[in-house]
Design a protein with these regions (language model features):
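Alpha-helical scaffold/interaction cores of sigma-54-like transcription cofactors
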Residues: 2-607
Length: 607
């Protein structure tokens, strides 16, 4: 009977977190309910997790509304049903089209229309929802003769009087109006909360069929989902075997360039990594990143591969990263191992002038016509304490001066606010950390094997690329691992600098020749003397002084210097001890033998 529950992902409407929604259902001894957020599919999978853990049968759907005017509710009977609902919602959000009064003819979803006097033909999967407050009107309605098509509809949007008041404040904020001027039709009824079964039976004493029909609808919806399976794009070449063969081929081809004398040690490391990559199901993840940097190189875009992916020899051979893990003895298992639950991490930086074209390439290559397989990863802005205080001050009609005074004194001991100040401080705590609106993750992109609509709806911000309703944490939980495509202005400056050198000197500089730079005597001299102004990451006065003090002229020493200057290392005394042992070899004997064996490059000091 609870076919229309809202979480706080019904932005500026619902007040319940997913966990609190489930906890309230348990408190009222409810064994099945449907989460149907307003024009949002953000919380569906966390709800499934939480409900199943609590022993509650979860049903998922969407409440389709124009503003707050409910048009119909869609419930997914299965995963195909969720696909239908997400696609339908996405099409309307992207095209900014209002929903009609009639839903499409879905094959795997159930539709519930709000009760009205207007009578229209219903398809087999369509029903009319009757709230307890509408029972008296039902008696004289033509719908009363169609009992088999009527279900009890008890919406849930909050759990207490306090949260109902918070809901009204959210509605006022959404409409940018004073609380005293909030129209009744723009807010929920005070009764939109859970009732026990006994209470609902009492409220529908002469209409028990409504409860029975609602229960039958919940039983029709059996949404099974395997969270652990990887949902990313796979079988790029037709099958997993072909993908793996291609990854192996390209890795060894790149190894010929990276390691002109390919040793047995390097071969063993490559084979070990390839085996783990295949076992964990990350072959396509590597191939898509490889495709990405290949396209960038073809377009003469500079990139930098970062993250724990820099520990991979396979990534180094493919050109995704430019750091040699063999030379630096980097630990691949930090990136991928059989027991690591988190997905692998490649952070690929491009120039701010090139990033949008790289993203557009991913959409053009991997998006399918009339369906979505690529989307930018969504994120959520949340209400923060000070911003909520300001918004609530406006809703209560306080002058700007009083709002600023409240902000200034809010956390001061002994502060005694007036009546409105007390209300604002109380409800600021209630609203704090609630999601406010959908935003875009800084760099994440999702590429799914099945349509993205099996997992989420999408919206279309001014950026021009579709954005998911799920965030990074939900995506990882359901097996969709993001690709990180970042923007860095420094790469743009490097490119323009190299163009200037070529114009003025006629010299072409290849910045990917890392080994050449490591051995360049001029580079070593600049580092030794701390002449690094204009060099990213090592140009601060403290860093330049440290480079000169240590006489740094190797890559490992540069890495150590950039580590020991961090506040934690510096405050612990390890920075001072490292410099002492670096400049005075006889002091290195002070290191504990075990520490010296584990960390010989840093003289037994953890940096």
């Amino acid at each position: 009977m609870f076919l229309n529950c809202h979480s706080h992902f019904s932005f500026k409407y619902g007040t319940l977190s997913v966990d609190k929604l489930v906890a309230e259902a348990l408190r009222h001894k409810i064994d099945a309910l449907a989460l149907t957020d307003i024009n949002s599919s953000a919380a569906l999978f966390p709800f499934i997790r939480a409900a199943q853990k609590a022993g509650i049968h979860p049903v998922v759907g969407i409440d389709f509304r124009n503003g707050v005017q409910q048009q119909y509710i869609g419930l997914a009977r299965n995963q195909e049903g969720l696909y239908e609902l997400n696609k339908h919602l996405s099409e309307h959000l992207v095209e900014k089209r209002p929903f009609g009064y009639k839903a499409p003819s879905f094959s795997h979803s159930l539709i519930i229309y709000p009760f009205s006097e207007k009578v229209f033909p219903l398809e087999a999967h369509e029903y009319i929802g009757i709230s307890p407050s509408q029972l008296s009107a039902l008696r004289s309605s033509p719908w009363a003769r169609k009992k088999e098509k009527l279900v009890l509809l008890q919406p849930v949007s909050f759990s207490s009087k306090l949260e109902f008041n918070a809901h009204r404040l959210l509605r006022s904020m959404d409409l940018n109006t004073l609380l005293s001027k909030l129209p009744m039709q723009e807010q929920a009824a005070p009764s939109e909360h859970f009732y026990s079964y006994a209470e609902m039976i009492a409220r529908c004493e002469h209409h028990s069929y409504l409860l029975i029909n609602a229960q039958k609808l919940l039983e029709q919806c059996q949404f099974s989902f395997y969270f652990q399976a990887i949902k990313n794009k796979r079988d790029l070449l037709g099958s997993g075997g072909e993908d793996f063969d291609y990854l192996r081929q390209q890795t060894y081809q790149g190894a010929q360039n990276r390691y002109p004398k390919l040793s047995q040690k390097v071969r063993e490391r490559i084979e070990k990594e390839l085996e783990l990559i295949e076992q964990k199901g990350f072959v396509s993840y590597f191939l898509i990143n490889y495709d990405l940097v290949n396209y960038a190189q073809h377009r003469n875009f500079y990139h930098v591969g970062r993250g724990s992916g820099a520990n991979s020899v396979v990534a180094y051979c493919l050109g995704i990263t430019d750091v040699d893990p063999m030379e630096l003895d980097l630990y691949f298992e930090r990136f991928i191992n059989l027991y690591r639950e988190n997905p692998p991490d490649f952070d690929i930086d491009f120039s701010w002038t090139d990033r949008d074209e790289v993203i557009a390439y991913l959409f053009k290559k991997y998006q399918k016509r009339n369906d979505a397989h690529v989307a930018l990863l969504g994120s959520y802005s949340t209400f923060q304490y000070k911003s909520v205080l300001r918004e609530l001050g406006k809703v209560f009609g306080l002058p700007k001066m009083e709002i600023e005074s409240l902000l200034h004194h809010a956390n001061q001991e002994g502060y005694r606010p007036d009546t409105y100040g007390k209300l604002i401080l109380t409800y600021a705590k209630v609203l704090h950390d609630m999601p406010s609106h959908l935003t875009i993750h800084a760099c994440g992109i999702l590429l799914s094997h099945k349509s993205i609509y099996y997992y989420t709806a999408t919206d279309l911000p001014p950026k021009g690329f579709p954005v998911t309703h799920i965030d990074m944490h939900i995506a990882e939980d359901i097996g969709l691992h993001k690709f990180d495509v970042l923007s860095q202005r420094g790469l743009g400056h490097i490119k323009s600098t190299l163009e200037t050198i070529y114009q003025n000197q006629g010299i072409e500089v290849n910045i990917r020749e890392v080994e050449k730079f490591k051995k360049d005597p001029k580079v070593k001299s600049l580092l030794r003397n701390g002449h690094t102004m204009g060099a990213f990451y090592v140009e601060s006065p403290a860093m330049r002084m440290l480079l000169a003090k240590m006489k740094v002229d190797t890559y490992l020493e540069l890495v150590a210097a950039s580590s020991i200057i961090r506040p934690g290392v510096a405050r612990s005394g390890m920075m001072r001890e490292y410099i002492l042992r670096h400049r005075n070899p006889e002091c290195r004997n002070q290191a504990h033998p075990v520490m010296a064996e584990i960390m010989p490059e840093t003289y037994g000091i953890m940096v």
